[in-house]
Design a protein with these regions (language model features):
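Short, amphipathic alpha-helix enriched in basic
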Residues: 6-42, 46-51, 60-67
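N-terminal mitochondrial targeting presequence
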Residues: 1-3
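Hydrophobic alpha-helical connector segments
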Residues: 16, 80-119
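Residue-level detector of well-ordered alpha-helical segments, enriched
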Residues: 22, 39, 65, 69, ...
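Short, basic, alpha-helical segments at the C-terminal edge of helix-turn-helix-like DNA-binding modules
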Residues: 70-76
Length: 121
């Protein structure tokens, strides 16, 4: 990926890393535009990424975008609830916190989640 293709801190990212960075913005755009090229382009432009480079990060289209969004939520959850913290908790509390985190992460994007489930069904 060329340095001129992506703005700011995103210039040095691999395509896999770029996927994770773009995923929340794509989910936000998917509320209005669905999980497709329009949402991808809107997210890329909002983050200062060349839409052509962004498209390279999602060769599988909507499914890749949805998988990246889920992976980003998983990564955020792992950072917020590290194993060292979870290991000290009773199993019920671990489950409660993990499920709670996932529900809170999806709440602002209920429509994106509905659209994602329709694609994955």
């Amino acid at each position: 990926m060329s340095a001129g293709a992506v703005a700011g801190d995103l210039a040095d990212l691999t395509l896999d890393e770029l996927r994770l960075e773009l995923a929340p913005a794509i989910a936000d755009a998917a509320v209005f535009d669905g999980w497709g090229k329009v949402a991808l382009d809107a997210a890329a432009e909002a983050m200062g990424v060349d839409p052509a480079v962004a498209a390279l990060a999602f060769p599988g289209g909507a499914i890749d975008m949805i998988e990246a969004w889920i992976a980003r939520i998983d990564a955020d959850m792992a950072r917020a609830l590290p194993l060292e913290v979870l290991a000290k908790l009773p199993i019920r509390e671990r489950i409660r916190r993990l499920i709670g985190f996932r529900l809170e992460a999806a709440t602002p994007s209920k429509e994106a989640l509905r659209r994602a489930l329709a694609i994955m069904a």
